[in-house]
Amino acid sequence: ENFFKEIERAGQRIRDAIISAAPAVETLAQAQKIIKGGD
């Protein structure tokens, strides 16, 4: 039972990291587009 709680906690941590990283990833993608000569 404890084992599953650990997995759940790790999963939440990973999800939080992805959620907080998403805006940065989007910003990087936009910056690359601009550098490559997009709009």
Swiss-Prot record:
- Where does the UniProt annotation place the signal sequence? none
Induction comment from the UniProt entry of this chain: By bacterial infection.
* Tissue specificity of this protein: Hemolymph.
* Subcellular location(s) per record: Secreted
Q: Which InterPro entries match?
A: Cecropin
Q: Which domain of life is it from?
A: Eukaryota
Q: Which GO terms describe its cellular component?
A: extracellular space
Coarsely, its chief localization is secreted
Keywords, sorted A to Z: Antibiotic, Antimicrobial, Fungicide, Immunity, Innate immunity, Secreted
Q: Name one Pfam family in it.
A: Cecropin
Per the record, the GO terms for biological process are: antibacterial humoral response; defense response to fungus; defense response to Gram-negative bacterium; defense response to Gram-positive bacterium; innate immune response; killing of cells of another organism
Q: Which family does it belong to?
A: Belongs to the cecropin family.
Role noted for this protein:
Cecropins have lytic and antibacterial activity against several Gram-positive and Gram-negative bacteria. Has antibacterial activity against the Gram-positive bacteria M.luteus (MIC=34.4 uM), L.monocytogenes (MIC=34.4 uM), and S.lutea (MIC=34.4 uM), and the Gram-negative bacterium E.coli D31 (MIC=8.6 uM). Lacks antibacterial activity against the Gram-positive bacterium B.circulans, and the Gram-negative bacteria E.coli ATCC 25922 and S.typhimurium.
Write the protein's name. Answer: Cecropin-D-like peptide
